[in-house]
C-alpha cells in the first residue's frame, strides 16, 4: 500500500524521484529546494525528516517504482544494439 506524507493542499512544483529503496537519499534531496520526494520504500527516520522539513514524501512500492524504467531501458538497449529483449514482470507486493 503506498504511503503519502505531507500537506495534501501544498502546491508541488519540484519533485525529486529515485526508484526502489532510495529513501536514504531524502536528506540529500531535501537540500535541492524540492516540494516532494518520491521513492519506493519508507523508513521510520524519513517519516520524521519529512515532517521536520515540510517536504512531502511518497513511497509507492519498491517494485512499482522500478518496473517501467527497467522495461524502457531494456527496450532502448535492444534497439540501440540490435539485440533481443524480453521484459518479464514478476508481481511483487513490496
What name fits each language-model region?
Residues 1-94:
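Hydrophobic structural segments
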Amino acid at each position: 500500500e503506498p504511503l503519502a506524507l505531507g500537506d495534501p493542499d501544498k502546491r508541488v512544483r519540484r519533485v525529486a524521484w529515485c526508484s526502489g529503496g532510495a529513501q536514504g537519499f531524502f536528506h540529500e534531496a531535501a537540500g535541492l529546494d524540492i516540494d516532494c520526494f518520491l521513492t519506493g520504500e519508507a523508513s521510520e527516520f524519513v517519516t520524521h525528516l519529512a515532517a521536520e522539513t515540510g517536504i512531502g514524501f511518497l513511497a509507492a512500492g519498491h517494485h512499482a517504482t522500478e518496473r517501467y524504467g527497467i522495461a524502457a531501458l531494456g527496450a532502448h538497449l535492444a534497439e540501440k544494439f540490435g539485440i533481443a529483449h524480453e521484459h518479464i514482470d514478476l508481481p511483487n507486493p513490496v
